[in-house]
């Protein structure tokens, strides 16, 4: 995770070389840091400085255009309104806490073909599975 200029976080999951290369190109990382096996700490510091130079709103379209497994971390409330998640029904479930409060919950498994029907289920009391 890397902090942006406006203190939001960028999550980068560029594990495969093609995604790492796309990420380095997208952020304009200096070539000397692209091979993170040489000096991983220096690469991490360089990426942090580059990401910190722009706001999340500046980075969002850059990452959207690049196939680099990178995104801006958003609060739960914003994620619940994301059209992609809404279309997939990821927040169609909820649980009820021991105090009776209804909370949004991700269905498990996430793949819809393996889920029970949407609905509200009571969460077990703390310590009970």
Stretches found by the model and what they are:
Residues 1-70, 122:
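Aromatic-enriched alpha-helical interface/lid elements that frame and gate functional surfaces
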Residues 38, 77-78, 97-98:
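AMP-binding (ANL) adenylation modules
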Residues 95-129:
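Flexible, small-/acidic-enriched active-site or ligand-binding loops
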Residues 1-5, 92-97:
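Short acidic-hydrophobic surface loop/beta-edge motif
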Residues 82-96:
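Short, surface-exposed loop/helix-turn segments at secondary-structure junctions
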Residues 64-85:
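Conserved PLP cofactor-binding pocket of PLP-dependent enzymes
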């Amino acid at each position: 995770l890397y902090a942006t200029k406006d203190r939001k976080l960028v999550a980068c999951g560029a594990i495969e070389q093609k995604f790492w290369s796309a990420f380095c190109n997208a952020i304009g990382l200096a070539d000397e840091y692209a091979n993170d096996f040489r000096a991983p700490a220096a690469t991490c510091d360089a990426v942090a400085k580059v990401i910190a130079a722009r706001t999340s709103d500046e980075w969002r379209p850059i990452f959207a255009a690049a196939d680099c497994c990178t995104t801006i971390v958003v609060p739960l409330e914003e994620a619940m309104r994301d059209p992609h998640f809404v279309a997939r029904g990821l927040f169609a479930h909820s649980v009820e806490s021991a105090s009776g409060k209804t909370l949004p919950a991700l269905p498990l498994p996430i793949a819809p073909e393996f889920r029970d029907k949407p609905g509200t289920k009571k969460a077990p009391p703390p310590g009970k599975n």
